[in-house]
Amino acid sequence: MSRMVDTMGDLLTARRHFDRAMTIKNGQGCVAALPEFVAATEADPSMADAWLGRIACGDRDLASLKQLNAHSEWLHRETTRIGRTLAAEVQLGPSIGITVTDASQVGLALSSALTIAGEYAKADALLANRELLDSWRNYQWHQLARAFLMYVTQRWPDVLSTAAEDLPPQAIVMPAVTASICALAAHAAAHLGQGRVALDWLDRVDVIGHSRSSERFGADVLTAAIGPADIPLLVADLAYVRGMVYRQLHEEDKAQIWLSKATINGVLTDAAKEALADPNLRLIVTDERTIASRSDRWDASTAKSRDQLDDDNAAQRRGELLAEGRELLAKQVGLAAVKQAVSALEDQLEVRMMRLEHGLPVEGQTNHMLLVGPPGTGKTTTAEALGKIYAGMGIVRHPEIREVRRSDFCGHYIGESGPKTNELIEKSLGRIIFMDEFYSLIERHQDGTPDMIGMEAVNQLLVQLETHRFDFCFIGAGYEDQVDEFLTVNPGLAGRFNRKLRFESYSPVEIVEIGHRYATPRASQLDDAAREVFLDAVTTIRNYTTPSGQHGIDAMQNGRFARNVIERAEGFRDTRVVAQKRAGQPVSVQDLQIITATDIDAAIRSVCSDNRDMAAIVW
C-alpha cells in the first residue's frame, strides 16, 4: 500500500512538472521549459512525453533518446490528458532531421543516434524491428537510416544495395530524404571506384536554380529537387562529392569548379577546402573483397590488407599452383637435369621452411638463383614454372614472374640507379623477378670497365638480395660464361645466388619434338618425310660452328628455331595449297594441315638465311 502511494505521488509530482513545462514552453520557450521537463522525468522516469519534451527543448543526450524509446509505449498519455501535442526534431542521417511524435519515429531517430555514437550493432538490431514500419511515411526514413549506418561504417556495397531498394507503392516519398539517400549512394560508389555510377546518383538530385539533371531519368527512378538554402549541409555535400568524383575521373577542371561550390553560407566546408588545397587528394577506394574480409563487420580497420587477401587467395590455390608449376615444367621437351634440380630444390625449400618454423639456422640459403645456358633452351618457361612452384609452396605470394631489364634498375645519371633499384625491389617483395641477359645490367667501356650507373644498380641490388633473402626471388639468366664474368664485378655478388641451373642445347631429336608440339595445337602436322628432313637439317645445324665459335643450334636459338621453322613452313604450305586450288585440283582438310618435306626444307633454309652467322653452312 505504501509503495502504491509513493508511485502515485511520483506520478502526480511528475505531472505537475510536466504541465508547468508545457505552459512555460508555450509562453517563454524551450530553454525555460527544459528544467521542468527534467524534473518530470526525475520524478517518473517512465513518463515518455516528458522525455520527448526534454529532447524537443534541446536535450541531445543519447541516454535521453534511449529512455524515450524504452518508454515509448506511454507516448501521448500526458499530452492527451491536457489536450496538447508535442514533437521533437531529431537528426536522422548526416544532414536532415525527422519530426518525432510516435514510437516508431523514436526508434528510427534512435537508430541514427546510435550510428553517430558508434553503437553500430545496436543500430542494426533496432532497424531489423519491422514495427518501425508502421506507417507509409516511415519506409523512406528507414531506408535512409539503414543507408546511413552502412555509410558511417564504410560498408559501401550495402549503402548502394540499400539505396537501390524499391519502396512500396504506398510509401510517402520526401525530396529531402531522397536527396540524402542519393548523396550517400554517390559517396559509396565513389569509394568503390565507380565514378560514373556516383555521377548517376548525383544527377538524380536537382538543386533548384542550379541544375536540372534529373530530367534524363524515367518515372521509375526516384529523383528530387531541393532549394539551395533548404538544407545547406546537404547541398554542399552534393557539390563536394561531385567534385571528388570528377577528380577520380581525371577531370580536374570540373573538380575544381564543383569543390568551389561546396559552401555553407558562402564558406567552404573543411573537406572542400582541404581538397582544393591539394589536387592529389582523393577519396580512398576499396573493393567488396576487402570489406567482406573484416573480422568486425562494423570496423573498417579490421579489414585485411591487399597482401593479406592475396596470401589467403594463394593459400587456397597453393595445391593447384604447385601442380600447375610441376606440369608446366614436365611438359618441356628434354631438360632432364633441370627437372631433377628443381625437384631437389623443392625438397630443400620444404626442409628450410620446417627448420625456420623450429628456429633452426638456414645460413647461406636464399631464394635467388641463376639459370644459365644458350637462348631458347627453356629458361623463361622454367622461371614461369618456378613462379607457380614457389607460390604453391608459400615462398612467394604471387605466381606471376615479373620480367625486368637494365632500364628498370638504372637511371640516366649517377645517383639515380640506387633509389630506382630499391624502389623496384620494394615493389617486388612477394614476387619473382626474372632478368634474361642478367649481365646487361652493366655496360662496358672501351677498356672493359663497367659503367658507374650500372655498378650503382649492382651494388644496391647486392644489398637488397641479402636483406630480402626470403622475401622475394630474383632469377638471373643468360650465357654461363657471360654470367660468370658479370658476377666478378662485385666480390659479393656470386654469394647471393646459391643455386645455378644449367640448360644444355637441345638435341636434334628434341628440336623436332618441340616443332611437333608447337604445330599440333595450330592444327598443323608434319608428315614422316618432313620430320626426317627436319631431323637431318637440325643435325647439320647442330654440327655447324659459326665464325664466332658458337654452335649452330645456339646461334639459331634452339627452341625458338623450331617454332620459327613451323611458322615459316606453314607459309610455304599455304602458298602450295592455294596454287593447288587455282590449278583446279581439290583441296582436302588434310591438305590444309600437312607440312611436307618440301615445305620444311624451304622453311629451314629461309630461317637460317636470316642469320648471317649461318651463311657458310653446307646443306
UniProtKB/Swiss-Prot annotation:
Q: Principal place where this protein is found?
A: cytoplasm
GO MF annotation terms: ATP binding; ATP hydrolysis activity
Could you list this entry's UniProt keywords, alphabetically sorted. Answer: ATP-binding, Cytoplasm, Nucleotide-binding
Q: Which domain of life is it from?
A: Bacteria
Question: What Pfam families does this protein's entry cite?
Answer: AAA (PF00004), AAA_lid_6 (PF17866), T7SS_EccA1_N (PF21545)
GO CC terms of this entry: cytoplasm
Q: Where in the cell is it found?
A: Cytoplasm
Q: Name the positions where ATP binds.
A: G373, P374, P375, G376, T377, G378, K379, T380
Q: What InterPro entries is this protein classified in? A: AAA+_ATPase, AAA_lid_6, ATPase_AAA_core, CbxX/CfxQ, CbxX/CfxQ_RuBisCO_ESX, P-loop_NTPase, T7SS_EccA, T7SS_EccA1-like_N
NCBIfam families noted in UniProt: T7SS_EccA
Q: Of which family is this protein a member?
A: Belongs to the CbxX/CfxQ family.
Q: What does this protein do?
A: Shows ATPase activity. Could provide energy for export of ESX-2 substrates.
Complex formation = Part of the ESX-2 / type VII secretion system (T7SS), which is composed of cytosolic and membrane components. Residues 522-619 interact with an artificial EsxB-EsxA heterodimer from the adjacent ESX-1 locus.
From the Swiss-Prot or TrEMBL record, give the protein name.
ESX-2 secretion system protein EccA2
Source organism per entry reads Mycobacterium tuberculosis (strain ATCC 25618 / H37Rv)
